[in-house]
Amino acid sequence: MKKAISRRDFLKVVGVSAAALGMTACGGSSASTSTSTAVSTAASSTASSAAAGAGEGGSGNDYKLTWNEVNGEDYGATVGAHTFAEKIEELSGGHITIDLYINGTLGSEAESMQGIQMGTLDIFRGNASSLPNYGAELIGTTGLPYVFKDMAQFEDVAESSLGDELLQSVEDANCGYVALGWLVEGPRSMFITPKVYERLGKPTDFTLDKMKGLKVRVPETDLMINTMDALGASATAIAYSELYTSLQSGVVDAAENGVTSYMSNSFNEVAPYFITDAHTFGCGVILMNADKWNGFNDAEKGWIKEAALAARSACYEYNQKQEQACFDSFADKGITKLEVSDIEKWQ
């Protein structure tokens, strides 16, 4: 049996990590474990009843929700989004449907986060590490460096009342979002361009001192900027849609992401040196506009919650398979994997 990380241990770890980054960690939230568990249980109960008769208990209104995803088809979060769309249409008897746009068709991450707040976009898979920038502090702690030792430990948290509490804390922050569930891509690691590899003397492994002065592209979030700065790099916030050309032109020396995103977006073509530092986990969160959420009745909310659970499972299963497939393809793709030989200095 896997040992789940406790709420106390989790908050202790994130407090230490946040202090190391010079950040404020929320040791608590207006959400409580008992409240979040009740919300989760109620949603599961309602959703189970809904499954017995698709569409029963709904308002009878038809809803077409718009979902934007910044990645392409060959990506876990996109697989999760498709699963969500199929499940919610099934559970609602066709009364709730999803229009899914991929490759950032409707905007960047920052534009999508703002769109959710303003109500011009219904659903977006955002990064938990971005949410403190928009007023939801507690859930952002999942993006702190080295909080989770592996994906199994994160899954333990996601399946627990603590996972429910973290999701509930977004709604309780009253910042315009409701967190429906998780879409996690796994560990995020560094990758560097050939020019940087040459400059570093063509290393056979990677050490923390090599991070010094590297211009590293990060998402437009304070947490990721502070993380890279703490590792000795020079963090540069650039929109995801501009990352490929920024690496190609030398605007940045390196970037960081999960290996599935690295491959599906062809970043390996311009940065074929992948460093296995796994400094954080890509804790994606399915976000909905709060006013839109409040417009649904209890049965409809139950269907949406169940669809989010199905999406999380599909995303997780896809990523488990794809991660290994990506690493197995490195040799054929001309990618060099650089192991970190002093990982204790990074943690």
Residues of each region from the PLM?
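N-terminal secretory signal peptides and thylakoid transit peptides that target proteins
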Residues: 2-21
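N-terminal secretory/targeting leader peptides
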Residues: 15, 28-29, 55-153, 172, ...
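A short hydrophobic/aromatic micro-motif that marks alpha-helical segments and, especially, helix-coil
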Residues: 21-22, 165, 312-315
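Bacterial lipoprotein signal-peptidase II cleavage site
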Residues: 26-36
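Ser/Thr/Gly/Pro-rich low-complexity, disordered linker/stalk segments of secreted
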Residues: 34-56
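A gly/proline- and charged-residue-enriched helix-loop-helix capping module
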Residues: 151-165
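Short, hydrophobic/aliphatic alpha-helical segments
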Residues: 168-170
